[in-house]
Design a protein with these regions (language model features):
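The feature identifies polytopic integral membrane transport proteins across all domains of life
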Residues: 1-2
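Long, well-ordered mid-to-C-terminal structural blocks that present hydrophobic/aromatic surfaces
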Residues: 5-6
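Interfacial and helix-entry/exit segments of alpha-helical transmembrane bundles
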Residues: 9-92, 111-132
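Cytoplasmic/organellar membrane-interface segments at the starts of transmembrane helices
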Residues: 41-43, 97-163
Length: 163
């Protein structure tokens, strides 16, 4: 659960930041107003795609590690019910792929031709989150060790207070 919360914080934080930066430039929330942003905002497109891949639970991202641990832990407790609950991952994946397709493919719409790509300070802010998403996806050991140690200490504190 700690891994899932950490992954969610990183992915949701990056997604809200990137969507906010896009809205700041375009002043529209309608996804139908966008297309082929990869041509006019390539850095934004890269960061948003990695973030959406993490939301899907793609291997190599923190989303995969978190979902894998949640499914394995849940399967040990609830068995085949987790297979049914795993369908939500497929629904989320379909949503993310549709979002990628609508934002980054098709012809460039005239009103989107002059959108400015991410500025340096925006790159740094989004980059920190995206690097953490990938780093913890490729090397989750520090995060797992930290959460294991913390949970062990919490368990000791609770068991001592019960006695």
């Amino acid at each position: 659960a700690v891994l899932q919360m950490t992954a969610h914080g990183l992915v949701a934080g990056a997604m809200f930041l990137l969507v906010g930066l896009l809205y700041e430039r375009t002043h529209t929330r309608n996804i139908l107003d966008y297309s082929s942003l990869v041509r006019v905002m390539p850095r934004f497109a890269l960061f948003m795609t990695i973030t959406l891949f993490a939301a899907m639970g793609l291997p190599g991202t923190v989303g995969f590690i978190a979902e894998l641990h949640a499914i394995i832990g849940g399967f040990q407790e609830w068995g085949n019910l987790m297979i049914l609950l795993g369908m939500s991952i497929l629904i989320g994946t379909a949503y993310a792929m549709r979002t990628i397709g609508m934002l980054f493919t098709g012809p460039v719409k005239p009103q989107m031709r002059d959108i400015e790509d991410l500025k340096l300070y925006e790159l740094v802010a989004a980059g920190v989150l995206v690097v953490a998403i990938v780093l913890f996806g490729l090397w989750p050991t520090p995060l797992i060790n930290l959460s294991t140690a913390t949970m062990s200490q919490m368990s000791d504190i609770i068991s001592q207070s019960i006695q």
